[in-house]
Amino acid sequence: MSLSLGIVGLPNVGKSTLFNALTRNNVLAANYPFATIEPNEGVVPLPDARLARLAEMFGSERILAAPVTFVDIAGIVKGASEGAGLGNKFLANIRECDAICQVVRVFADDDVVHVDGKVDPRSDIEVIETELMIADMQTLEKAVPRLEKEARNNKDRKAVHEAAVAAQAVLDSGTTLFAAGSKVDSALLRELNLLTTKPFLYVFNADESVLGDDAKIAELRALVAPADAVFLDAKIESELQELDDESAAELLESIGQHERGLDSLARAGFHTLKLQTYLTAGPKEARAWTIHQGDTAPKAAGVIHTDFEKGFIKAEVVSFDDLTAAGSMAAAKAAGKVRIEGKDYVMHDGDVVEFRFNV
């Protein structure tokens, strides 16, 4: 399963520095607008300590973590919805992503010039949201008359037309369709590929003064709720990537952080996309597989191979916690912790699974 988060932000907020840290790529990170033109894509492993334990238990030769894909997209400016700057390319690249990850600058640095001349997180967020909302308004302005005509001739299209009209009202009120939640049935509007229906995740690129200020962090979280928010220092994250684990832990402790910001970001990305993982293990590999929350066992099996879904018979399932408590698969079976589940079983995060299928 390949789902991606598009990293967006105004110029000079630290997008490419963050992306470099995520992927250890040397993407051009220059102090001028549009240093990123073609989107750069990077795949980052989702940190999962459970895999090392499974590999130890099963004698696995290698560990394969679930991938999280990030796309670094050109910096946006006011007027992007009208094609200003690299607006048209920006909007096209965003449409191809499954979620929007906005980097917001909250660090002070006189050597890195903010495009608007001042650091104002609320304003930065509003600029990008406004451009995305305007683009959606333009899409709906063309679509609503067409959908109205279709609804007159085909009653099945009536619900789509009504959802589009509701979406217009939400956008006119200055709210993104993601923030509107259940007020708009976004599933009905999937054919329009509206930008603000995509889930939002905010990354506040902060310095030590902000990272150590609980009140400021709470204020910024409230600013973007109900979306998830991650707080990190992109420069520090870049430095951490060059250090061994012991030195990295010392650096994190010195700035009062308990874990790498990138680990928090990868998990938040998974949460934003409503994803989870199930686990498989054997002599060759211990592996995490990405599925949607709510997926059934056959659907999950299909992530490994489509034949597994088509010929699904049953799944042997044990929770990771029950397996590790037992100490081995044999002991877990003896303790009655391994279950046989059928096609209607809804998967849970951390299920350790072996599928039975016939093709």
List where the protein language model places each region.
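C-terminal-of-GTPase-core extension/linker across diverse P-loop GTPases
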Residues: S2-V8, V13, F19, R146-H348, ...
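Residue-level signal for pocket-adjacent positions within structured domains
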Residues: L22-Y32, P39-E41, L46-A49, R53, ...
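Amphipathic alpha-helical transducer elements in NTP-driven molecular machines
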Residues: F34, D48-L51, L64-F70, A84-C97, ...
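Glycine-rich, phosphate-binding/catalytic loops in enzymes
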Residues: T36, L86-G87, G117-D120, A218-R221
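Conserved G1/Walker A P-loop phosphate-binding module
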Residues: M1-A84, N88-D111
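Short, intrinsically disordered, mixed-charge
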Residues: R24, E56, A92, E96, ...
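Conserved Switch II/interswitch segment of TRAFAC-class P-loop GTPases
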Residues: G42-P47, A74-A84, R95-R157, V170-K183, ...
